């Protein structure tokens, strides 16, 4: 069950902090998927262990596919393992918390939001007594970034946006995916986070890499693509990006982009 990480796990684990977005809950008896409903066998958490995961992002829109109870039990497993999480939680209050991590004298603030389900569907979002993703609002984003900047933290913002499986016109799934950015609003939303003070903004929804840019005083990566999600229908969904952030004196001084490909 560590097979997916056999060639990349050591590289990922070498970081002081390894952050991954996982949007599939672990379900006993999981036998695969039907349509767009996903789960994972519990033993595949060994892949995350082999990758040296420290922080799990929970902004994804599939963690509640088998019900929030499995999302809850999955989060409880992360807690048991001593892993931190953000962008989702055991309830809406827990999901909205900003994760602060101090590493080698640097303060980092991780904050994540599910933009897509806030706008189009609520099934993936946390409720007052149910697990799920953190909802998005400009007011919440503004408040979170201001508080983090006031504390002198490096602000890392992540978004779950519209997912695109492939951009070529011959095999595109959704018409909106004909363009590099999935929605006209994506650039606006991501740039607004930088305008509010974010140091780096990352789209963790993409099934294949999207564009990136230096904008104002920040960096924006609109989509990193797949890591362990096994979509081999198109070459695009077998590709991904791993970001290595180098931080000194609570400033991002370098970002290294490592391209990856799933060799099935």
Regions found by a protein language model. Give the residues of each.
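Acidic, metal/ion-coordinating pockets
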Residues: 1-264
